[in-house]
């Protein structure tokens, strides 16, 4: 794959390991949509990009090419990752072939904390709706929509009822209390210096952050690839293809022991494969 930055975007040629559908619809991001022509629009903090198909690849149209070059992790050779994972298990090979265009995004840590608190026991459409309402209510207006609000803005609302009225349900106090915890001194920068075990333990101190949410935050907000978030789809993957008699609480450790520093990549390929195929028909 070749990626070249220009003043108004990024040109993608020979995009073997880059497919916007795979990247944006594999459960790692919620602030995106697709227009009537099939182009994907992506929002991160106050930044915006539009991904358009070209004859020989894709063009990422944006006035923030440096930001989105890093955001899409375009310096990483995903071909090597695909090759290593494909040689491990037959189902892993099938999952990689199916979702070969996936790239794990390098997203903002604060945005990931609140997005995945909202994601708990929720579906993607509703998650997107809640996040969109929060951005519209508290975020700065940009030419392309509303920015994700700062921690200061999230914390300055009068009570959790504000988020309840936006549809957050039982997660409303979690958003409110976590925003205030971050505002009052929870050291996000310190998480980047901790190993994954200690970072997870620190994240679990935040309201609304359980094991799965903590692992998602670490994978998508800290780019810790030695984690394996477990939800109902991952449990299905384990019981269908890897069954060894473990309790559900032990599945994440099993996969991390199996895939090591490639665990996060393996999780995304397997999750996307099973969820898409199970919803669309038999494998």
Segments from the language model and where they lie:
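HhH-family (HhH-GPD) DNA N-glycosylase catalytic core used in base-excision repair
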Residues: 1-283
């Amino acid at each position: 794959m070749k990626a070249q930055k220009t003043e108004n975007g990024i040109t993608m040629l020979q995009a073997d390991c880059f497919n916007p559908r795979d990247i944006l619809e594999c459960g790692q991001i919620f602030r995106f949509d697709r227009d009537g022509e099939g182009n994907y629009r992506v929002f991160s903090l106050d930044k915006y990009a539009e991904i358009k198909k070209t004859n020989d690849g894709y063009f990422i149209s944006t006035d923030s090419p440096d930001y989105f070059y890093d955001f899409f992790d375009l310096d990483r050779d995903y071909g090597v990752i695909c090759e290593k994972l494909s040689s491990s298990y037959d189902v892993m090979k099938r999952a990689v072939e199916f979702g070969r265009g996936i790239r794990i995004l390098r997203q903002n840590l604060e945005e990931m904390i609140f997005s995945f608190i909202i994601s708990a026991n929720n579906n993607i459409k509703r998650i997107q709706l809640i996040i969109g309402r929060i951005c519209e209510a508290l975020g700065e207006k940009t030419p392309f929509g509303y920015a994700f609000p700062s921690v200061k803005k999230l914390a300055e609302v009068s009570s959790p009822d504000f988020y309840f009225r936006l549809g957050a349900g039982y997660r409303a106090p979690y958003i409110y209390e976590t925003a205030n915890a971050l505002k009052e001194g929870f050291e996000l920068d310190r998480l980047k210096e901790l190993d994954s075990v200690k970072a997870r333990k620190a994240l679990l101190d935040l309201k609304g952050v359980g094991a799965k949410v903590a692992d998602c935050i670490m994978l998508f907000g800290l780019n810790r690839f030695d984690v394996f978030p477990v939800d109902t789809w991952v449990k299905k993957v384990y019981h269908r293809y890897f069954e060894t008699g473990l309790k559900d609480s032990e599945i994440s450790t099993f996969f991390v022991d199996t895939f090591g520093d490639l665990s996060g990549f393996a999780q995304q390929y397997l999750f996307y494969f099973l969820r898409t195929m199970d919803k669309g028909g038999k494998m």
